[in-house]
């Protein structure tokens, strides 16, 4: 099913212009959703705004936003007052700068979108732009009024396909200072055996990012739990947690490097061993990826089974009895 555009407008780069849409590249809609339910009746609960002091429900026409200036004291802001301060939008993403893809700290990344054409003439312009950016290995910095605010977007070419992605960027005041966060971390110099072991471990575990190998174990467990309850089967038992022994940093490095009693070999002498480790790691990675896909399939089957069981339960009227 084709995605629905979150925004439509024009992308302009100098004299070039094309009609584009922003389509959300990530979504949580496939996750299992749980609702609040009355335990006694089985009916779904609904939220209601009540006055903090009187406890009385407040009708929609009496509700207004407010900024708290002191404890219990608010300055109210009317909807039309907010509408008046929204920047005038031109429905245009204006690109004014090209820069290296690595120039923007990932802490500024907000939400990812697919930047796609909405007609055939625009598709040709976008492909041309994507090809040029890929050739130069650069990203574009654009600006547009999105969802009431003037937002900056980092536009990057997709590795394959001649397409573009756009990521809204956090404002500078929203990104916390790394210097402040790490100000209390003691400055120490790491050298000798500890550094050799650390670099050996890093060299022995090369790989590539594979999103399919990342398992959402909570989602899988939740699907299994819901399915078991709907089918009246025993609930799955949690796996016992292993108690980790507290060891020194050096001992932990030695154990990770597979050398508990002596330092890791020098880089030149470790080629054969590293190569062997890489092969084993590749097999393990393949097995893990395969297991992940199987797990994902089981999750989808669990959701499908849950949906089917839910429909059957609603027909027989046993949902509320199950709790």
Curated annotation (Swiss-Prot):
GO biological process: DNA recombination; double-strand break repair via nonhomologous end joining
Region (Disordered): 255-323
Span of domain Ku: 12-197
Gene3D superfamilies: 2.40.290.10
Domain of life per record: Bacteria
Pfam families (alphabetical): Ku
Gene Ontology molecular functions: double-stranded DNA binding
Keyword DNA damage found: yes
Record's keyword terms, sorted: DNA damage, DNA recombination, DNA repair, DNA-binding
Acetylation listed as a keyword: no
Biased composition (Low complexity): 271-297, 304-323
SUPFAM superfamilies: SPOC domain-like (SSF100939)
HAMAP family reported for this sequence: Prokaryotic_Ku
NCBIfam families (UniProt xref): Ku_bact
Similarity comment text for this entry: Belongs to the prokaryotic Ku family.
Function field: With LigD forms a non-homologous end joining (NHEJ) DNA repair enzyme, which repairs dsDNA breaks with reduced fidelity. Binds linear dsDNA with 5'- and 3'- overhangs but not closed circular dsDNA nor ssDNA. Recruits and stimulates the ligase activity of LigD.
Subunit text: Homodimer. Interacts with LigD.
Protein name listed in UniProt: Non-homologous end joining protein Ku
């Amino acid at each position: 099913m084709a995605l629905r555009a979150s925004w439509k407008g024009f992308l302009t780069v100098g004299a070039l212009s094309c009609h584009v849409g922003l389509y959300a590249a990530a979504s949580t809609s496939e996750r299992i959703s749980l609702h609040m339910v009355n335990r006694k009746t089985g009916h779904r609960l609904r939220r209601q705004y009540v006055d903090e002091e009187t406890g009385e429900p407040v009708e929609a026409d009496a509700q207004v936003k407010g900024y708290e200036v002191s404890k219990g004291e608010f300055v109210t802001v009317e909807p039309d007052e907010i509408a008046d301060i929204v920047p005038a939008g031109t429905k245009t993403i204006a690109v004014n700068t090209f820069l290296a893809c690595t120039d923007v700290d990932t802490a500024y990344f907000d939400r990812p979108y697919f930047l796609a054409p909405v007609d055939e003439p625009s598709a040709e312009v976008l492909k041309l732009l994507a090809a040029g950016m890929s050739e130069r290995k650069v990203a574009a910095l654009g600006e547009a009024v999105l969802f009431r605010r003037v937002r900056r977007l980092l536009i990057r070419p997709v590795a394959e396909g001649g397409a573009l992605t756009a990521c809204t960027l956090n404002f500078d005041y929203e990104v916390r200072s790394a210097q402040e966060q790490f100000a209390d971390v003691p400055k120490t110099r790491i050298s000798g055996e500890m550094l050799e072991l650390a670099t050996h471990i890093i060299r022995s575990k090369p790989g590539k990012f594979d999103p399919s190998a990342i398992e959402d174990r909570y989602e899988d467990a939740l699907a299994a739990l819901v399915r078991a309850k709907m089918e009246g089967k025993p609930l799955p038992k949690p796996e016992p947690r292993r108690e980790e022994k507290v060891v020194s940093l050096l001992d932990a490095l030695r154990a990770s490097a597979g050398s508990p009693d002596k330092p890791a070999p020098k880089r030149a002498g470790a080629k054969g061993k590293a190569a062997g480790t890489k092969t084993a790691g590749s097999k393990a990675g393949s097995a893990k990826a395969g297991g992940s896909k199987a797990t994902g399939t089981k999750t989808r089957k669990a959701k499908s089974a849950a949906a089917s069981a839910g429909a059957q339960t609603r027909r027989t009227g046993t949902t509320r009895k199950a709790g």
